[in-house]
């Protein structure tokens, strides 16, 4: 059976057993901030198992895409060198949420694996493990299924603590947990290894193919297990592993799915398709990279983006080892889409985007790879011992973008290891240097503990009556706040919008008679709305009745900007592509800021198109529609959800322009798109690798911005004695005149340098037959010094030259060595010494190098290094 047929058979079998087929969730976990990537089928059902979420079904079956690279679960360094390690894999799984339990789960697994209708695996080839004290599972396997005792293995607490076992699953130190039962396939005596639980269990003869987890306990902080009222089942079977078994091959890389990717990789690289570890690395990595990019991850220097960058660069390095010329990795995407696109349509939809991102990252890495490899080669040549120092690993990471595991790959090929502890020390030191001093206000959101949920009335009102439920001062609960005191007020009902989804919290005031509390911000913790501010007059007590008043003008301007972000988001996806995802936003009364995923700067014509599209929707003046519905219905209508946000059973769908923009949003918005009046982008730029930011203004603020721009144009025209109509012509003339003057200046400087060169050459010293000239020429820039060094090399013949200058309060250095000496003396080495002496850095070619620093007082000492440099080198 082909891998695709096995996947479909698994899903179909469990559908016949009353399971709902659920699509794979994103590789970016939406309900677990502690998890870097989705790495198991149960991740998307975590809240179901915890009893925090109810779904319309109690039985589910999935084929879940998973990534294990980075974080706790990291297979990266083993990929390509073993038969079964991958960065990306598919986990087939069936799940029961308080429905069936051990007997049915075991029966389903055995039936699917061994019946002629399904996989038809030989029963005598299957071994089973259970937790040592799980007699129930053991009896089901032996007495009902009929597995002989000699192929049953009880596994106890083999990890040094109670319930710490390969056959006991826990979600954490506390919470749902339970025993598990694993099914192993015996590849036969020709493969070395022993059955599970034996001293030889790490061999490859017995391979785990399916794990059934029985969640039947809740573990409390004291370590005691309490039975769950509704036990559940979580199972997982690796598609690649079971495919290898059914296709009668020992390595996952020999299955049909990988054969097409290996062939495509070999073709793109231009190498033979044989059993090469580097080719396996490339074929594996195209899967994880393709799926991660399709799910919205872009290469960057932190978090998930950094893991993606590491994987891409590792693939590129292994491709280069095999002889790849130029960019090749992106060319394999088409084969990935052909192999897996029918099961995962997001690959088809995002193919061109994946290719663009990979090609861009390859080209960027190529610029630094060659230089970094040369540096590493030099460091390894000087290495004493078998451990690459942490400082070297960090230098390659920090300067050349070499992930530590890429350096580790190169070291492994030479039987070297890395000083990982030293690398981490360097990283820690960098973090300390980078950490800016900052102070934070009182974090009431983590301190306030109120069971009462505030009722929000702000969608339809900006005023109202309310009762004070609680008061806080300096993080402590109090019964009253006096005049002049800052604190937090919690009401039973409020029209104040709490900061969420990028929209700032409302401001305004509360009042009752002569008591007034000025609200500067509103936030939310749990169900409670926190009104932050100060008592302007009187004394406010718990239980008091107050009138609420939101600052209307600020609210109105803010909601226009919020609605504009929705229109901008839709326009971005229309102009740039469906890969655009919101990465963050800030909406206040002055402007809007919108961060989104994109891999390159936006072109001017694209910015103009965005403005045109948004303003066209504004001019249509369509009604902004809101609807309360369930999450599944909202998604079927095409509503976009903000990634990372948690949504309840009921969600609010906001639509503009009919189907132009449909998003889940709980914010305050305009009544009609025409209320926004005008939309103008004021800036666009990058904030991180793969993340762009647009800032824009709307309404009155947009008009004010345009008026200011008009005033600047008039002022510029006045400066060049022109007007708006001929401003460009006037500026062009000024720039042309400036260019001619700069050219004349360069010619004069060249003549002066030539004259200086004649004078300087006479000052050169003879050191062991080498003319050494080291002098300072203050006021000269680097360009002038470079030209002078070239001239002096021609005049002096066999020479070493070091020139320095203090130019615009900085030290400029240029070193030159004539070609006949570069075998013994290198300009780059001299420059490193000289630049370090003035508190800077430098380097370059053996015959020419540049550098600089900040310590002008040390320039003479730096220049004095030239003579001993020659004396020691000759």
Swiss-Prot record:
Which cofactors? Zn(2+)
Mind listing the UniProt keywords for this protein, alphabetically? Aminoacyl-tRNA synthetase, ATP-binding, Cytoplasm, Ligase, Metal-binding, Nucleotide-binding, Protein biosynthesis, RNA-binding, tRNA-binding, Zinc
Q: What class of enzyme is it?
A: ligase
At the top level, the lineage of the source is Bacteria
> What's the catalysed reaction?
tRNA(Ala) + L-alanine + ATP = L-alanyl-tRNA(Ala) + AMP + diphosphate
| One of the GO BP terms on file | negative regulation of DNA-templated transcription
Q: Which residues bind Zn(2+)?
A: 562, 566, 665, 669
Check the record and name the CDD domains matching this protein: AlaRS_core
Listed EC numbers = 6.1.1.7
What is the UniProt remark on how the cofactor binds and its stoichiometry?
A: Binds 1 zinc ion per subunit.
Where does this one sit in the cell?
Answer: Cytoplasm
An example of a Gene Ontology cellular component annotation for this protein is: cytosol
Q: Which GO terms describe its molecular function?
A: alanine-tRNA ligase activity; aminoacyl-tRNA deacylase activity; ATP binding; tRNA binding; zinc ion binding
The UniProt entry, under NCBIfam families, shows: alaS (TIGR00344)
Its domain description in UniProt is: Consists of three domains; the N-terminal catalytic domain, the editing domain and the C-terminal C-Ala domain. The editing domain removes incorrectly charged amino acids, while the C-Ala domain, along with tRNA(Ala), serves as a bridge to cooperatively bring together the editing and aminoacylation centers thus stimulating deacylation of misacylated tRNAs.
Family the UniProt entry places it in: Belongs to the class-II aminoacyl-tRNA synthetase family.
What role is this protein assigned? Catalyzes the attachment of alanine to tRNA(Ala) in a two-step reaction: alanine is first activated by ATP to form Ala-AMP and then transferred to the acceptor end of tRNA(Ala). Also edits incorrectly charged Ser-tRNA(Ala) and Gly-tRNA(Ala) via its editing domain.
PANTHER family linked: ALANINE--TRNA LIGASE, CYTOPLASMIC, ALANYL-TRNA SYNTHETASE
Output this protein's name: Alanine--tRNA ligase
Q: Give the species this sequence originates from.
A: Pseudomonas savastanoi pv. phaseolicola (strain 1448A / Race 6) (Pseudomonas syringae pv. phaseolicola (strain 1448A / Race 6))
